[in-house]
Amino acid sequence: MRPAALLLLPSLLALLAHGLSSEAPITGEGHATGIRETDGELTAAPTPEQSDRGVHFVTTAPTLKLLNHHPLLEEFLQEGLEREEAPQPALPFQPDSPTHFTPSPLPRLTNQDNRPVFTSPTPAVAAAPTQPHSREKPWNLESKPPELSITSSLPPGPSMAVPTLLPEDRPSTTPPSQAWTPTQEGPGDMDRPWVPEVMSKTTGLGVEGTIATSTASGDDEETTTTIITTTVTTVQPPGPCSWNFSGPEGSLDSPTAPSSPSDVGLDCFYYISVYPGYGVEIKVENISLQEGETITVEGLGGPDPLPLANQSFLLRGQVIRSPTHQAALRFQSLPLPAGPGTFHFRYQAYLLSCHFPRRPAYGDVTVTSLHPGGSAHFHCATGYQLKGARFLTCLNATQPFWDSQEPVCIAACGGVIRNATTGRIVSPGFPGNYSNNLTCHWLLEAPESQRLHLHFEKVSLAEDDDRLIIRNGNNVEAPPVYDSYEVEYLPIEGLLSSGRHFFVEFSTDSSGAAAGMALRYEAFQQGHCYEPFVKYGNFSSSAPSYPVGTTVEFSCDPGYTLEQGSIIIECVDLHDPQWNETEPACRAVCSGEITDSAGVVLSPNWPEPYGRGQDCIWGVHVEEDKRIMLDIRVLRIGSGDVLTFYDGDDLTARVLGQYSGPRGHFKLFTSMADVTIQFQSDPGTSALGYQQGFVIHFFEVPRNDTCPELPEIPNGWKNPSQPELVHGTVVTYQCYPGYQVVGSSILMCQWDLSWSEDLPSCQRVTSCHDPGDVEHSRRLISSPKFPVGATVQYVCDQGFVLTGSAILTCHDRQAGSPKWSDRAPKCLLEQFKPCHGLSAPENGARSPEKRLHPAGATIHFSCAPGYVLKGQASIKCVPGHPSHWSDPPPICRAASLDGFYNGRSLDVAKAPAASSALDAAHLAAAIFLPLVAMVLLVGGVYLYFSRFQGKSPLQLPRTHPRPYNRITVESAFDNPTYETGSLSFAGDERI
C-alpha cells in the first residue's frame, strides 16, 4: 500500500493545484492566480465563470499630445507624459495606430438598431480594411505568440474564437476536467481588449501540444491524462471594420472591398476621442458613395448622441464640428459588386469654449477669452450694485463652463457713498416700479473742500404716502432742501449743498407703486461751477474743471429735440460761481419735419411712456432722386393705438402700412423721396410701462434702378466706383494678404440690372508666384505650380557668372502670401584678366601694339623682307584666371636670296585669309607712301618757282615772238628801278 500511495501522490498534488487555480483565491500579496496587474489596474484572464462579462476597456494608444494646449492643461499633460515614459508591460500583441476597433465605453453606441457593435469574434476576416493614418507613433512591443494547450477536442462549427493566454497563464501541470472551451460568443475579460485577428480567407488553426500519459496504479483507481493536437480549417464571412482614434488629428479612410463576393455589406464604425476640453472637427476630403450606402456622424459625450450629418449633407470640403470631445462615424455599404463606396475624411481636435456670458441688465461685461483660462469682468451702470461674482473664469471640462453664475445689477435701498464725485442714486427696481413698505437712506459725502449738486433725472411717486426728502447735511436732523410733500414741481436747476453732504430719504407705504426716482450727483470745487448734465444728449466745454468764464454747448441724441433752456451757457460770478442759464432738456417730441439723409423718429417722451389721446405727425424728406428705407426696430404700442406710414408728403398718399399692438423688427421701403408717419394714441388708456412706444430709424437709399447689393466676401473687401449701384457701376473685390481672388475681381452693373460676373471668393494662397527666367541661364524646378516648399535652381550658361542665390525656396508666411527665400539671381558676363602685350620679334612687327590685350583678342606677327616667320602668325588671348596666350610668340629668321623669294612666295601662298588683308595693307603703304612723298616734293618745287621766281621751271621755248606793247606816258608804272633811272647788279656800283 505504501508504494501505491506514493504513486498516487503526484496526481493528487496536480488535482489540488488545479482546484486552487480555478477558484482564484487572493494570495498574500494581493494577486489572484488568474489575475495579472498592468499599469496599476487589475485585469482578469477569462474563466468559465466570467464568460458572459463585458470586455474590460483598456486603451493601448499613447497619451494624447496636444500641440497648442492651454496652460491650465499642463497638469494633465504632465501626468500623461509621466505615464507614457513609465515602463510598459510586455503585451502578447502589437497594436497599430489607430488600432482595430476595441470595445469602448462611449455612450449610446454600444448597440444601434438592435445589432451587435461588432460581429462575433472570429480568427478570420474576408478582407482587411484599409488602415487609416494617424500621427500617433505605434508602440514597438515584441512578444512571442503564445501557445494554447487544451484538454478536449474542439466543438464543430463554422468558426470559433480562440483566446490568447499570457505565457505565465499557461497551465504547467495536467489540466483538470473543467477546462475552458472556446465558444462562438468570444472571450470574456482578458489581460487586454480583445482584437479580431486579421487572417487569410482560408485559415488553418493549429493548436499544438504534446501527448503525455501519466498512470497511477492502486487498489481502486487509475488516472490517465492525454493532450490532443487538433487542426481546424474554416472559411470566414466578412468581419468587423472598425477603429478607435485617440490622437489630436488623423485620417478616416473607407475600407477596401472584400476579396470574395458576399451577401452582406460592410458595417463599419469609427470612434474618435480627443482630450476633454477639445472638440472634434471632421473635414470631408473626398467622398463617392453608391446609391443605398449610408454614412452618419454623431457627437458623443452628452446625455444623448447628437446627430451632426449624414450622406445627404456630406460634400467635398465640408467641415463638421462636434461640440464634445467624442464623435462617431458609421458606414454601411452594399455587398459586392455594387459596393463599397469610397471616402476620405480628416479630423483634428479644436479647442472648445465657454458660452458668452449673459450681459446683466443695467450693466455690461468684458471678456478676455472664451477658451479655458479666459475670464469675464462684470460691472454695473451708475446707481446699480453688482450682486454676485465680479470675475468669472472659464474652466476646462468635457464642455468648458464658467466657474460661477453670471451676476446681476440691482438698485440698492440706501447706502453711504463717500468721496462722491459723479454718479447716480436710483430707487430699488428702477426703471421699473419700486416695492411697498420701503425706507431707504443715502448719505452722499463729497471730497474735502468740495460741494455737491443734485440733478433730478426722474421722480415718479404714487399719490399715496410715498415720499422723497433731500436734506442739506449728513443726518435726518439736517434741514430739508426738497420735500415731495411740499413741492409740486421739480427744480429744473437742481439742488446745491452748502457743505460736503446730502442726505436722501425715500419711503413708501403698503399700497401703490410707481417708477420711483433717479438722482444724478456731481461734486465740484470751490470757485468753480458744477459739471452740467443733459439727459439723452451731450455737451462740449471750453475748460474741463468749469472755472468762471467756461462756456458749454449742448446737443441732443438723434430723435430728441432741445427744449427749456439755452444751447450755450456760461459760468459767471467770481464770488459765487454759477451758470447763467439752466441746463436744457432733450425730449422726444410729438411731430416734426426732418430733412436729414438719416435719422431716428421716437415715440413721444421715449423711453418714458407716451401720453394718451396724442395725434403726432412726422414728415421725412430726402433728395428727389432717392427713396427712404424705414427700419422699425421697436414697436410696442397698445392695441388701441395706431401707427401709420404714408408713401408721400401728406396724409392723402398711399398707405405703406398701418400697425397696432406690439410687433417685431421689420423694414419698409418707400417709392418716393418723402414719407409721412402718423401716430394716434387711444384717449381712454395710456402706456405706463418703461420703453413702451416705438423707435424708427430711416435711411436715404437709391431708387429701384440699381443692381442688387453685393455682399462682403470672407477674407476680403469690396470697393464700388460709386455709392449707388446704378447701371455702369463697377465693384472691385480685393483679398487680404495671404489670399487671392478666385473668379472675376471686377463686377459691372449691366443694363438689365444684373451683375456681369458671379461673386468671387478669397482663397488662401498656398504657392509662390513664378520667379521667372534669368537671361543667359536655365532653371531646374521641383514643382511646376511652386507650392510651399518648392525650390527653383538657376544655372548660368558658359561664360557667365551667377550673382545672387542659386536656389530659391518657397516659404509660407502667417501674415501674407508665400514668398521666395530670395530675389531671382542674375547671370553676368564672366570677367577675365587681360593678357600682357608681347614684344615684336626681332626683324619683325606685331599688330596691334598694346600693353594689355583683353581676353579673346588676337595679335598678328610679320617679318621684314629677307626673314622667315617661324611659329604662329596669329595667337589669341585665351580667357582664364589668369588669361594666357594660345601659343608662344614666333621669331623671324634670315634666309638666302633664292630661298627668300621662294620662301616668301610660299609664305604668301600659305598665308591665312585672316592675315592676307593686313599684309596687303602693309604692302600698299610701303609702295604708295614714298610715291606720295615724291609727288608732294615735286609739287612744292613747282610752286616755289612759279610764284617766287616769276617763271615756271617747266616753261618751253616759244616758236614765235611775243607781241610788243608800247608803254605810254599815261600808263601806270610803279617800278622803282625805272623811277630812279638806274639799274644796279650785284658786283657793280653803277651802270
From Swiss-Prot:
Q: Which segments cross the bilayer?
A: 923-943
Residue ranges annotated for the CUB domain, each copy included:
241-353, 413-524, 590-701
Please state what is observed when this gene is inactivated: Mice show reduced exploratory behavior and motor coordination, altered maze performance, and poorer memory retention. Molecular, morphological, and electrophysiological evidence of defects in dendritic arbor patterning was also seen. Secreted and membrane-bound isoforms in null mutants exerted opposite actions. The secreted isoform showed an increased neurite number, while, the membrane-bound isoform displayed a decrease in dendritic arborization. Embryos were viable, fertile and normal in other respects.
Q: InterPro entries, alphabetically?
A: CUB_dom (IPR000859), SEZ6_CSMD_C4BPB_Regulators (IPR051277), Sperma_CUB_dom_sf (IPR035914), Sushi/SCR/CCP_sf (IPR035976), Sushi_SCR_CCP_dom (IPR000436)
Transmembrane helix listed as a keyword = yes
Q: Which residues lie on this side of the membrane: Extracellular?
A: 20-922
Database matches in CDD domains: CCP, CUB
SS bond list: C241-C268, C354-C394, C380-C409, C413-C440, C529-C571, C556-C586, C590-C616, C707-C749, C735-C762, C768-C810, C796-C827, C835-C877, C863-C892
Per UniProt, the keywords (alphabetical) are:
Cell membrane, Cell projection, Cytoplasm, Disulfide bond, Glycoprotein, Membrane, Repeat, Secreted, Signal, Sushi, Synapse, Transmembrane, Transmembrane helix
Ranges where the Sushi domain occurs: 352-411, 527-588, 705-764, 766-829, 833-894
User: Which residue ranges does the entry give as Cytoplasmic-facing topology?
Assistant: 944-991
Question: According to the UniProt entry, which residue ranges have a biased composition of type Polar residues?
Answer: 175-184
Tell me which residues are glycosylated: N286, N396, N433, N538
Entry similarity comment: Belongs to the SEZ6 family.
**What's the protein name?**
Seizure protein 6
Say which species the protein is native to.
Mus musculus (Mouse)
